[in-house]
């Protein structure tokens, strides 16, 4: 008599299901109640995440397009690097038009063409949470969104309390009429809170904060200075306040780089990319933190190169410390989209992402590691309970 898969021991079922590609987990959960419960268990989640994050030589990324998000892997080597699309991630519906995405340890904060709300999504678990904004985010005359954003969480014992930070520290189109605003949304309480940050005197030069170990980081410059970017500043999601500015590496700032971008390295370190806009525009440096605490940071140089007119300033970048490889996304050859892969030996490979013409979001790529973080559903309000 043949044995049905549903009659197998639970540990065998967990092992089998853990081999299912992440993009197909929604179908697994819908198969039966038992499989749905298994897929949500802590043991199974750790098993599948370990399998997804230890594929040899591959970096998992999400390609962002207006109506869909696609999971892909990038195999990095100095002979034949390649990109492989794993398939489209199931979102809410094709009518949801995505404008921008922020990644935080497996959670995606998705901004829509509908400027009145955002949605936080865990592609691994399929959980979503819609958040209504207090007011739309593009307030400037040009409709450019000058708000800064970050998604993060506070550790509360065995669980994590997800929070969404949104602030406006400078409006360059109206320098004489500055109306700063700092607010945070708590997923546990389902409430927005206005933060008292009246003495904040640093201007962030990136719209999206990079999350690392409970804090979100931005490159900044003194609001009263016209100097180059020489510090980073962080927001502590537990204390719900900004910490002191931390210096960028002097070895880079003394060269007068005018462009700085940040990235997270394996959820453990920060990487900083430096490049000139005009002079020495083909030279760039990347530094990585060796230690980062509340009031101090130390850096180590990862890479410095001059590649001539081969690469443009990357919108997003990633590094592989073990392989000494830099991956940067450029948009110079629009409508085509490329990842530049650069190694320590100064080799350069361009990988065409084959993004359909006219489909563009910012950032167009984000790194991805599956996460078991639970997105709490909003509590029923009194009027909802009465229905």
From Swiss-Prot:
Signal sequence extent: none
InterPro entries in the cross-refs: F-box-assoc_dom_typ1 (IPR006527), F-box-assoc_interact_dom (IPR017451), F-box-like_dom_sf (IPR036047), F-box_dom (IPR001810), SCF_F-box_component (IPR050796)
Domain of life of the source: Eukaryota
SUPFAM superfamilies for this protein: F-box domain
Domain F-box: 2-47
Protein name (Swiss-Prot/TrEMBL): F-box protein At5g41490
């Amino acid at each position: 008599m043949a044995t049905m898969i549903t009659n197998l021991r639970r540990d065998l079922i967990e092992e089998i299901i853990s081999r299912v590609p992440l993009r197909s987990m929604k179908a697994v959960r819908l198969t039966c109640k038992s499989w749905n419960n298994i897929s949500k268990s802590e043991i199974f989640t750790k098993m599948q995440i370990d399998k997804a994050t230890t594929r040899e030589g591959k970096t998992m990324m999400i390609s962002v397009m207006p109506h869909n998000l696609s999971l892909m892997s990038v195999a990095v080597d100095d002979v034949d690097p390649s990109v492989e699309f794993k398939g489209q991630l199931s979102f809410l519906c094709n009518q949801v038009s995505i404008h921008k995405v922020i990644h935080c340890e497996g959670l995606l904060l998705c901004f829509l063409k509908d400027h009145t709300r955002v949605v936080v999504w865990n592609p691994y678990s399929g959980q979503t949470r819609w958040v209504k904004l207090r007011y739309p985010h593009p307030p400037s005359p040009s409709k450019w969104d000058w708000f800064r954003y970050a998604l993060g969480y506070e550790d509360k014992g065995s669980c994590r309390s997800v929070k969404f930070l949104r602030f406006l520290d400078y409006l360059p189109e109206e320098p004489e009429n500055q109306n700063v605003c700092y607010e945070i949304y708590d997923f546990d309480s389902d409430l927005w809170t206005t933060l008292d940050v009246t003495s904040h005197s640093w201007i962030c030069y990136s719209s999206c904060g990079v999350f690392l170990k409970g804090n979100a980081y931005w490159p900044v410059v003194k609001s009263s200075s016209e100097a180059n970017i020489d510090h980073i500043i962080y927001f502590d999601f537990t204390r719900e306040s900004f910490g002191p500015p931390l210096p960028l590496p002097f070895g880079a700032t003394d060269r007068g780089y005018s462009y700085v971008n940040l990235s997270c390295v394996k959820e453990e370190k920060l990487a900083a990319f430096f490049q000139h806009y005009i002079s020495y525009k083909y030279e760039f440096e990347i530094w990585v933190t060796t230690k980062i605490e509340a009031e101090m940071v130390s850096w180590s140089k990862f890479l410095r190169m001059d590649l001539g007119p081969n690469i443009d300033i990357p919108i997003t970048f990633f590094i592989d410390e073990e392989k000494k490889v830099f991956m940067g996304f450029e948009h110079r050859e629009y409508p085509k989209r490329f990842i530049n892969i650069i190694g320590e030996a100064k080799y350069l490979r361009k990988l065409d992402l084959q993004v359909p013409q006219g489909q563009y979001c910012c950032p167009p790529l984000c790194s991805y590691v599956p996460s078991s973080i639970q997105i709490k559903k909003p509590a029923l309000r009194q009027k909802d309970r009465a229905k």
